[in-house]
């Protein structure tokens, strides 16, 4: 029991000890030792802009080597170079002001570890509540200090049961660490859901010298938020100077944003409109092609119709000509028949007339012969008459005979 009383008496003395002095301010320290060479390069009459000191918070104008305006140096060819060195090559200055990333919305300004312990004690004296400053580093460091102090006092005060007390302290420390981890996670969750409107608690923290970054949600952030209980032991090992610089304006670094539903919807609408436009263009081209083919077919139909009409007219004309020729032929045939009939009739009349004339001549001849034999004749002439009558009979026989019968008789 004496050991525990000694521990309780020693704790406030150790924790209430004044913090060590802070690190000296390096805002006035000169960074570039070759300032004389730079003045010789630019000339004494050129007004040089103020340089950038990495120990000072961002917001001042950058160094002339990197981001200065073009100097009035006349190069032999071309325009002067805007920068002598590549960005981040020689002088590792930040291109944008350091700001709190929206991926870790509960990030606050961190001061040195000793100052944080003193501020935590002051805040506990005001409202008897432990505040989570930064990402839970102060609470975890306080618990570790208490555990180490209790272990040291127990080992110094007890000679026979030091091993048992140290084991019990280690078990208690592990239990306390397990109990503190959910509380720290809950505090982080509460801080991430804080609104943009500043609270009076934040004003009191600003008065005490603690700068709390206001969380602002710009959209869906890609990345995993690490809980403070996972990184508390690592952050205790880091140097406090790495977390001392914070953005005065509370700017945010650009983070990778996931495409919103509206962007995806707009992209789908754009693709749909492109497909519709291509379909309309193809339909218009096919319609124009079909229209051109229809016009060509209409022209062909018109030409063929005109040619058909011309052929029909020619056929009608030839038909009329053929009918006319047929009529002329029939008329000529009739004329020829009539002419042949008339000729045949004329030939028959001529033959009859000739026959009649021949019969008359023969009759006249016979009559003359008869008349000549009926005159006066004597006895001497009686013999001659008989002879002539015989010859006259033969002549009548010859004249009366038909030529056909003669031919038959001769044959």
Curated annotation (Swiss-Prot):
It comes from the Eukaryota. Induction: By light. Pfam families: bZIP_1, MFMR, MFMR_assoc. Residues 297-332 are annotated as: Leucine-zipper. Keywords: DNA-binding, Nucleus, Transcription, Transcription regulation. Residues 1-14, 235-244, 264-293 have a biased composition (Basic and acidic residues). Its main location: nucleus. One of its GO terms (cellular component) is nucleus. SUPFAM superfamilies: Leucine zipper domain (SSF57959). Transmembrane segments: none annotated. InterPro entries: bZIP, bZIP_plant_GBF1, bZIP_sf, GBF-like, MFMR. GO terms for molecular function: DNA-binding transcription factor activity; transcription cis-regulatory region binding. Residues 148-164, 249-259 have a biased composition (Polar residues). Binds to the G-box-like motif (5'-ACGTGGC-3') of the chalcone synthase (CHS) gene promoter. G-box and G-box-like motifs are defined in promoters of certain plant genes which are regulated by such diverse stimuli as light-induction or hormone control. This is Common plant regulatory factor 1.
């Amino acid at each position: 029991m004496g050991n525990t009383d000694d521990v309780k008496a020693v704790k406030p003395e150790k924790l209430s000890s004044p913090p060590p002095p802070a690190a000296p301010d390096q805002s006035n320290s000169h960074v570039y030792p070759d300032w004389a060479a730079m003045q010789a390069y630019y000339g004494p009459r050129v007004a040089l802009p103020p340089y950038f000191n990495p120990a000072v918070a961002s917001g001042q104008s950058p160094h002339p080597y990197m981001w200065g305006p073009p100097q009035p140096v006349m190069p032999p060819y071309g325009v002067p170079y805007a920068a002598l060195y590549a960005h981040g090559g020689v002088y590792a200055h930040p291109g944008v002001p350091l700001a709190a990333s929206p991926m870790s919305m509960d990030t606050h300004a961190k001061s040195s570890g000793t100052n944080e312990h003193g501020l935590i004690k002051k805040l506990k004296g005001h409202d008897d509540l432990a505040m989570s400053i930064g990402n839970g580093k102060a609470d975890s460091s306080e618990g570790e200090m208490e555990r180490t102090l209790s272990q040291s006092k127990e080992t110094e005060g007890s000679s026979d049961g030091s091993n048992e007390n140290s084991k019990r302290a280690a078990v208690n420390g592990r239990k306390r660490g397990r109990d503190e981890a959910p509380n720290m996670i809950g505090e982080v969750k509460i801080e991430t859901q804080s609104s943009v409107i500043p609270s009076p608690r934040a004003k009191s923290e600003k008065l005490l010298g603690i700068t709390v970054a206001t969380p602002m949600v710009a959209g869906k952030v890609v990345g995993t938020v690490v809980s403070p209980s996972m990184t508390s032991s690592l952050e205790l090992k880091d140097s406090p100077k790495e977390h001392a610089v914070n953005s005065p304006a509370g700017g945010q670094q650009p983070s990778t944003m996931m495409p919103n539903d509206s962007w995806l919807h707009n992209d789908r609408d754009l693709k749909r409109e492109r497909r519709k436009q291509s379909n309309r263009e193809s339909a218009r081209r096919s319609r124009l092609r079909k229209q051109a083919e229809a016009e060509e077919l209409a022209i062909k139909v018109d030409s063929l119709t005109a040619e058909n009409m011309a052929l029909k007219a020619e056929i009608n004309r030839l038909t009329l000509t053929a009918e006319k020729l047929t009529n002329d032929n029939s008329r000529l045939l009739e004329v020829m028949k009539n002419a042949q009939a008339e000729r045949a009739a004329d030939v028959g009349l001529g033959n009859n007339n000739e026959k009649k004339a021949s019969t008359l001549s023969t009759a006249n001849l016979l009559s003359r012969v008869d008349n000549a034999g009926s005159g006066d004749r004597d006895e001497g002439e009686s013999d001659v008459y008989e002879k002539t009558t015989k010859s006259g009979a033969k002549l009548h026989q010859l004249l009366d005979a038909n030529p056909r019968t003669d031919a038959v008789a001769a044959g």
